């Protein structure tokens, strides 16, 4: 936990002053309800470190400190951090690549991912209940893209058959509260 706290010390939750560590702890707590594997717990605490705090250099550091298994799980939970040209890819490219990766992800990666998406969906729901559609102004893809992504990720989890059913159902029910109608496609606005 100390490593996660240090890595994300300057980071807060999107458009808030909530320390990012709160999200990492929440994801880990959800994961702990579904497995007793310590490596999976550690990976849950570190699931955003590669994506948000240094890319592959951070993955190598995690491997040195916590082992290959933890590093592989964290890599599996991470969106692509750089394109072949060295810059961060556009939102839709990152999301589509991540969604596609779920088809061959191992069950532990899917568990961490679903716990992450559940906590994020709870945050979206709370913001939406508090602010209405203004809550979507902090999201790159706005309301339509956010709804598309959450419905699509639930669909992809279901296709794998590897996400614990109770967890999947909770993600699905939470998403349905702020996005009751499925958005079947999304194209980024240019």
Regions found by a protein language model. Name each.
Residues 1-190:
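Active-site helical microenvironments for divalent-metal-assisted chemistry
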């Amino acid at each position: 936990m100390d490593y996660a706290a240090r890595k994300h010390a300057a980071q807060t939750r999107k458009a808030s002053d909530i320390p990012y560590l709160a999200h990492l702890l929440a994801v880990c707590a959800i994961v702990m309800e579904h497995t007793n594997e310590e490596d999976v717990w550690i990976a849950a605490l570190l699931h955003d470190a590669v994506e948000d705090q240094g890319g592959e250099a951070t993955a190598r550091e995690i491997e040195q400190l916590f082992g290959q298994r933890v590093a592989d799980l964290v890599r599996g939970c991470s969106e692509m951090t750089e394109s072949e040209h060295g810059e961060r890819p556009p939102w839709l490219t990152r999301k589509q690549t991540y969604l596609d990766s779920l088809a061959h992800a191992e069950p532990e990666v899917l568990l961490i991912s679903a716990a992450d998406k559940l906590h994020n969906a709870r945050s979206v729901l709370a913001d939406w209940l508090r602010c209405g559609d203004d809550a979507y102004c902090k999201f790159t893809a706005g309301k339509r893209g956010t709804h598309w992504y959450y419905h699509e990720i639930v669909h992809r989890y279901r296709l794998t058959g590897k996400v614990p059913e109770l967890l999947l159902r909770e993600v699905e029910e939470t998403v349905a509260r702020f996005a009751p109608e499925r958005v079947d496609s999304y194209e980024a606005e240019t």
